[in-house]
Amino acid sequence: MAVTRKTFLLPVMLATLAAAPLSAHSGRQDYPSCNLAQQRALKAPIGGTIRDPRQAHIAMRADILQADIGTARKARRLSQAEAQTLWNTVARIHRDANRFVTKQGFLSAGETASYDRALDGVAMRVCR
């Protein structure tokens, strides 16, 4: 029985795939805030000072992002100055969202989209 080229290549290809890393970013730690689709779909509970579902969404995203900034800083992926700048940016976004809800009683879809884009920008800097 003759061994064909296809028969020989299949085991080699399977061995190569098995040895390949599962993630394209195997050398980099992925933080929860790096998954932007998942972050934009977050549903957070309402309670305490949080009175609006969109406000709760922004608050939860901000909390996750600030935790990831702290983790990235501890891992020395961010300098102290960069981590502080990013942390303050997230805190400002969270504070602004809370002010809107206090002022008008809710956070509109447009405002939420704007805050989500701003948080995405911070996340991209943490996840690079």
Residue ranges and their predicted role:
Residues 8, 48, 64:
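Residue-level detector of functional hotspots within protein domains
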Residues 24-49:
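N-terminal propeptides/low-complexity segments immediately following signal peptides
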Residues 49-56, 60, 67-117, 121-124, ...:
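Surface-exposed, polar/charged faces of alpha-helical domains
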Residues 1-25:
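Classic N-terminal secretory signal peptides
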Residues 32, 62-64:
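Short N-terminal helix-initiation segments at or just after the protein's N-terminus
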